[in-house]
Amino acid sequence: MDAPIEVDTQRARFQNSTGRNIQYVDDVSWIKSKHTLQFGGNFRHIPTIHIRNDKVVGSLASLEALSDADVSTFLSAIPSSERPPTCSVTLTTGCLQSGDAQRWDRLYASTLGLVDNIGILTTRDGSLKALPFGTPLANDTTLNAVEFYGQDVFRITPNLTLTYGLSYGWQTAPKERLNRQTLVVDTSNNNQSLTGPGYIAAKEAAALQGKMYNPTLGFDPVKSAGRNVFNIDWGDVAPRASVAWTPTFDSGFLHRMTGNRKTVIRGGFGLVYDRINTVQSVIIPMLGVGFAQTISVGAPLCNASGTPGAGCNAAAGTGSPGAASFRVGVDGSLPLPTVPAVSIPVVPSTPFGELFSFQDDPNTKVGRSRAGDLTIQREIPGNMIVEIGWTGRWSDRLPQGVNFNSAPYFFVDQASKQSFAQAYDAVATALAAGQTPAAQPFFENQLAGLIGSACAGSSTATTATQFLANAAASNFTGGLVSSLFSVMDGRRTCLGLPTFQNRQLFDLHMRTYIGKSNYNGLIATLRKRTSHGLTFDATYTFSKTLDQNISNQNQAGIYSNSYFPNVDYGPSLFDRTHIFNLSYVYDLPLGKGHRFGGGSWTSRLLGGWYTSGIFSAFSGLPLFVTESSQVWGGGSIFGFAVGMIPTVNPSSFGNSVHGGVTGSNGIGTTGNPANKGTGLNLFADPAAVFGDFRNVQISKDGRTGRANPIRGLPYWNLDSSLGKKTALTERVSFRITADFFNIFNHVNFVDPTLSLTQKASFGVISTQLVPTNRDNTLADGSRWIQLGLRFEF
């Protein structure tokens, strides 16, 4: 088991989208003196019907029973008494490495069939009446997109042209035929709509003062709220301007450099707006609470169905989940969830009346990019043109998700002034070293009264710190901050104390507009126009793109740190420093009219041959040694894995394939040739490299390891073609071709995984990179030859 909820719904689910695009476009051009004026408009009416039987993850419109441990929604953490001891300096056999405690707990829960929750997706009609189990979720929406533009190409002189213009547009929010959309609201504040930045800022401010911020959330149907799921962004004004200059110098150095009207200098700047795609405009608004709801039975006890199996001890509670929890196949029929009655606004019950909700920020903005470029183009002898230039993009307001239930890891205990982060790091450091952690004031004060109470179950711990270290050791050693907050909230609920997190939902994903990225690139291009049968185009790019580890609009990802997204600021996952591409076509100088000609039949035999090819070479993508996605409390499911901190310069590791690597100390060992491994590894000594990274310390570190990545394997490939065209008559000819994909049979490998939780496969290379045009069951990434014969008439 590797997740606390059913993530494989994305394999079992079905989705159907039926969309149309009714579009009207009108453009006008008017030439007046030195001006070429252009005006136009674009109107789109976009009706869309989307039907699905899932809510991304967590449930289907059919019953599911889920098993997990440690990052569970409901199931108690596996206590240390039910796992082998943690290895230390003095204990090296019959023990678990600190990073393997979570894997053991999950094996324990899945082997015994311990049920975390039993759930199903239930849907409601436009009046919130529950529909029969198995009814899929459906939305029938319409929206409009409008754009206008104006532009002037002003040829000031024969050598100088100025282009400037302005565009303006907007996109409406989707209108659902039965109003089956909701907004998340604060029920204690007159059902005020909540925004992503506003909620996160309020929660942060409260935590720094040692206070809880958990307003009771409601989900208000748009008809009741009297508004759309998000506001129209009316401010998308997009100016742009560019200039092109052909210098004319009659003599001297500048004349020799620029030639006689053979050089063009171009520069420009523009503001460009994104569009809101179907996921954000149609799908997310239908995944809120109310018209779609995951109902569940959380952590049922072994006697829940009245037919407990052997060994059932429901009274053991959290002290022994193996004895107290419902066991699939042992304790009878699964207990069924009950569909709750709802009112307006829909208020999920506690604990976890709903597992997940997806919402659009009602104040969402359209992403934008400030784009600039400056290039110099020069014609040179040989029918060639060389161009060198810079291009840049600075983007903001990009769509990205925040989690309302991001754990406030900076929460300050007002009595001791110790933060959760400080207490957490102290315990995590001690456990990693195999030591007993000292009592931490934060845990003792925030869980006051726990020791000696029924809320501690059968634990023999004498301090709250020891209780947490025993019950949730892997939460400390594995960076599972969100899960640890869930454990603490469970105990605080039992003690009658307010919780750190909202307990109505496990996670609330809100798509908001605070993402940032930038790109800068130096581009050099050499183009040859066709002469002597040869034409080619060669381009080299030296660039860097940086972002906050954000994802595309159609992704469900959230920031690993919703409070401070810039902790992940670093090279984008697709960043390549060096990129070179070359394409060419060459008509061989054979046959009539060429250097090597001949008679009629000789010319027909020798003539018409040509070759072409595409060569590509890239430097490696950024790679990160990762721990969990919960390091900053971002959430259990949708967050991105956090990069560990390198203690040496990652460039010292290199980025080439090493052969004959067996691995050691349980690190990189799946590649051992003696165990039928590949023997290939990104590192000559994976264990040594693994030791050069440390866990993020949330009380001290302001950035993650994404700021300083390892670079993955470089790539190069040549595809080439050889062909001949032969004329039979004036109107009939035939062509034979031989296309060679990866003509040199060069192996390109997929970058390996580098995860704290998968030590055995650390750095192990086991997969070839298969081009998208291959049938990987037949050719993999090896040389592929395609022969062709074509008649033309």
Predicted feature residues:
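Short, solvent-exposed micro-motifs at the edges of structured domains
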Residues: 133, 140-142, 159, 169-173, ...
